[in-house]
Amino acid sequence: MNSAGLEQCGMIMTRKNYYITTDGLLKRNENTLYFINKDLKRPIPINKIYSIYSYGALTISSQALNLLSKEGIPIHFFNRYGFYSGSFYPRETLLSGDVIIKQAEHVIDHDKRIELARSFVRGAALNMRRVLSYYGIENGISDTLMDLDSSNSVTDVMNVEGRIRSDYYNAIDSILPEGFRIGKRTRRPPENMTNAMISFGNSLLYSTVITELYNTQLNPTISYLHEPFERRYSLALDLSEIFKPTLIDRMIISLIKKKAIKAEDFEHGMNHCLLNNSGKRKFLAEYDRRLGKTVKHRELGRKVSYRRLIRLEAYKLIKHLIGQKSYEPFVMWW
C-alpha cells in the first residue's frame, strides 16, 4: 500500500473495494472522486468503485455523497481501533414490499424465526468443524450441535452457539504459537493479538455483508438470530456468523502460521492490543484477496468468488421467505 494508505484490490470484479487507512478528503469532480491529503491527490473513477472502507478521519463533500448514492455505492466507517462505526447506505432501489412483509412474518412467527435462527447457527458450527478438520484438530462440535434441535428460544440457540464457539477457539489454540493464542475471547477492547485480529476481521466481514444485502431486496434491519434492534443492520450479523469461520478464522490462522502477521504489526496498551497501520494494511490486503478468490460451485457448476457466496446466501434466504425453497445454510465443501 502506498503512503496515502489507499489500497485497491480485487482481480475478479471490474469494480473494486477501496480501503482508506489515512486521514483525508473525498470530493467529486464530475464523475470522478478524488482522495486528497497533504501528500497527494488520487483520482478514483466512480465506475471502478464497488464499496469504500474508511479507517481514517475522512471528510466527504455533499457532492461526493450524492454521486455515491446515485451509483449505489456504500461507505463503511471504522474508528481508529478498527471497530465498525457506521455506514453510508445509499438510497435503496431494490426494495420489495412483499419480501419485507415476509421478513417480518418470519420474525413474528416464533416457529419460523427459531427455524432460521437454528439454521444460521448450524451453518456456522459446521463451518467451524470444517476449519478444525482442515487442520486435523479433534473437536466435539457435532455433540454440542445435537442440542440445537431441542432449543426452543432464540436465547437457547444463542447459548448453544456460544458453547460451540468457545470450544472452537480452544481447539484453534492447540495449533497456534504461544504468543498468538486466543485464550479468553475479549472484544472491546481485545486484549491480545489474535483477539485483535478476530475483532477487526469480524467488523470487516459485517460491513461486507451489509454491502451484499444492499444489492438484494432484503431489509438488513430485520433479523432472526440477533434481535432486530434499532440502529444496526442485524441481518448482516446473522449471515456473518456463517462466514466467519470461512473468511476470517481460516485467514487469521494462515496469516499466523505463515508469519505474514508478526508482533510488530500490533500496538499494545495497558489493557488492549490492536492492529497498527502496518497490520491493518496486511490484513485488508489479504482479506480482499480472499474475497476475490473463486471456488467451483457445486449447484451452479461454475466458479464463484467468496464475495458472491455471501450474495447467494441472501438470495437463498429470500427464496425461503417467499416459500420457493427451504433455506439450507452455506457449508464449505472444500
Curated annotation (Swiss-Prot):
State the organism of origin.
Methanothermobacter thermautotrophicus (strain ATCC 29096 / DSM 1053 / JCM 10044 / NBRC 100330 / Delta H) (Methanobacterium thermoautotrophicum)
- What Gene3D superfamilies has UniProt attached to this entry? CRISPR-associated endonuclease Cas1, C-terminal domain, CRISPR-associated endonuclease Cas1, N-terminal domain
Q: What is this protein called?
A: CRISPR-associated endonuclease Cas1
Keyword Repeat on entry:
no
| CDD domains (UniProt xref) | Cas1_I-B (cd09722)
Do you know which HAMAP family this protein is assigned to?
Answer: Cas1 (MF_01470)
- Write out the similarity annotation: Belongs to the CRISPR-associated endonuclease Cas1 family.
What InterPro entries has UniProt attached to this entry?
CRISPR-assoc_Cas1, CRISPR-assoc_Cas1_C, CRISPR-assoc_Cas1_HMARI/TNEAP, CRISPR-assoc_Cas1_N
